[in-house]
Amino acid sequence: PYYRAVSDEVEMYEAAYEARMPVMLKGPTGCGKSRFVEYMAWKLQKPLITVACNEDMTASDLVGRYLLDINGTRWQDGPLTVAARIGAICYLDEVVEARQDTTVVIHPLTDHRRVLPLEKKGELVQAHPDFQIVISYNPGYQSLMKDLKQSTKQRFGGLDFSYPESDVETEIVAHEGDVETEIADKLVRIAERSRNLKGHGLDEGMSTRLLVYAAQLVGKGVDPMAACQMALVTPLTDDPDMRDTLSAAVNTYF
């Protein structure tokens, strides 16, 4: 997978992996957190198990449960247990979406013990030496209800992500969207304008992911104005005035 390093995050992650330190990635949506984890798993030649967290997720969804089949009941390992057994990197995406009582099950895996108790089964899984846990979340829209407990936060080393510098972002958009640098540069300038509106009518500026979408549409022969409308303006907001403002920014460059 393609990943363009922005600062020293690759070296820092490698050092954390050597120490088998659990890692927390913080940053806005679409800034490359998940791609970074995929890239690091590929670089370290380790399997990656990704779990998209949601508020309906229970501890059993992570750890495992008994299932009924023709022969009676059998135990089915959850993704966290599988990762701990085989020595994979387990990536919990948007971990604040999960309920706090669910995230507590990772505690024994993220300190010196490195074990996972399967209470229903009466088994204690000793984590494989290669096992590591990575979580990510967006610190921008946490409420008091949806934040990590201090007891969870203080088990992780943290890496901060944000949108790259404009020249780096241009390079990423040109590569991923397969368009000329000139188009990518204009898209990045539009995004920078939208990011200045964060907190003034927008919850979040245009992400690098949206810029790549717009670039891909342009690459497929779509008119740049229409591509920006579809990929950048429409998904971002429902407010008509805000849309006009964003469309004006698009018109400035295309």
Residue spans for each PLM region:
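Alpha-helical lid/collar subdomain of P-loop NTPases
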Residues: 1-3, 10, 165-166, 170-171, ...
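AAA+ P-loop NTPase catalytic core and its hallmark functional loops
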Residues: 1-185, 189, 252
